[in-house]
Amino acid sequence: MFKATARYIRVQPRKARLAAGLMRNRSVVEAQQQLSFSQMKAGRCLKKVLDGAIANAESNENIKRENLCVLEVRVDVGPMFKRMKSKSRGGRAPILKRTSHLTVIVGERGQ
């Protein structure tokens, strides 16, 4: 099993989980194709993390890309940046800029 992570990504976890669903339980090649045609920002971020996990597998254990599949995709909630928006009569409303931690684990088929 080979893991790659990206932390503090400025994508809402709810939207990143939609993109993560495109690659669950697929071979690595299929997952890359799915993410490359996705127009979501989270899809681009997940593709970079997936490429990192594939590079870890190829460089550390000399495993071919065709034999790899996505074992686990995890999208966790990161810290939130808090901003304020001006409202009427001197009031204000909170704005939460959400972040995500992305984790992709790949391994050989049958693990």
Curated annotation (Swiss-Prot):
Domain of life: Bacteria
Keyword 4Fe-4S: no
Keywords: Ribonucleoprotein, Ribosomal protein, RNA-binding, rRNA-binding
GO cellular component, one term: cytosolic large ribosomal subunit
GO MF annotation terms: rRNA binding; structural constituent of ribosome
A GO BP annotation: translation
Alphabetical list of InterPro entries matching this protein: Ribosomal_uL22 (IPR001063), Ribosomal_uL22_bac/chlpt-type (IPR005727), Ribosomal_uL22_bac/org-type (IPR047867), Ribosomal_uL22_sf (IPR036394)
SUPFAM superfamilies to which the protein is assigned, alphabetical: Ribosomal protein L22
Keyword Ribonucleoprotein attributed: yes
Family: Belongs to the universal ribosomal protein uL22 family.
Function: This protein binds specifically to 23S rRNA; its binding is stimulated by other ribosomal proteins, e.g. L4, L17, and L20. It is important during the early stages of 50S assembly. It makes multiple contacts with different domains of the 23S rRNA in the assembled 50S subunit and ribosome. The globular domain of the protein is located near the polypeptide exit tunnel on the outside of the subunit, while an extended beta-hairpin is found that lines the wall of the exit tunnel in the center of the 70S ribosome.
PANTHER family reported in the protein's UniProt record: CHLOROPLAST 50S RIBOSOMAL PROTEIN L22-RELATED, LARGE RIBOSOMAL SUBUNIT PROTEIN UL22M
Subunit architecture: Part of the 50S ribosomal subunit.
Designated name of the protein: Large ribosomal subunit protein uL22
Species per Swiss-Prot/TrEMBL record: Chlamydia trachomatis serovar D (strain ATCC VR-885 / DSM 19411 / UW-3/Cx)
Higher taxonomy: Bacteria, Pseudomonadati, Chlamydiota, Chlamydiia, Chlamydiales
Gene from which the chain derives: rplV
